[in-house]
């Protein structure tokens, strides 16, 4: 499980961490939401600033 921080005023969005590497991650949403180009992802105790680089259905990829 991971959490997405899209905007300081927006609620936190939970998602599934599908795959992770040193340079990025693949995540999956439970339902479709509009993602901004830049987000923050929290998984475990690690919080990373990310850029969304691709999206296919409910899955999307980010680079750190």
Region roles according to the model:
Residues 1-64:
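Structured alpha-helical
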């Amino acid at each position: 499980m991971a959490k997405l921080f899209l905007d300081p005023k927006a609620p936190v969005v939970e998602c599934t961490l599908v795959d992770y590497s040193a340079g990025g991650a693949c995540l999956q949403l439970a339902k479709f939401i509009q993602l901004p180009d830049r987000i923050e992802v929290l998984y475990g105790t690690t919080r990373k600033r990310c850029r969304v680089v691709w999206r296919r259905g409910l899955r999307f990829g980010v680079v750190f």
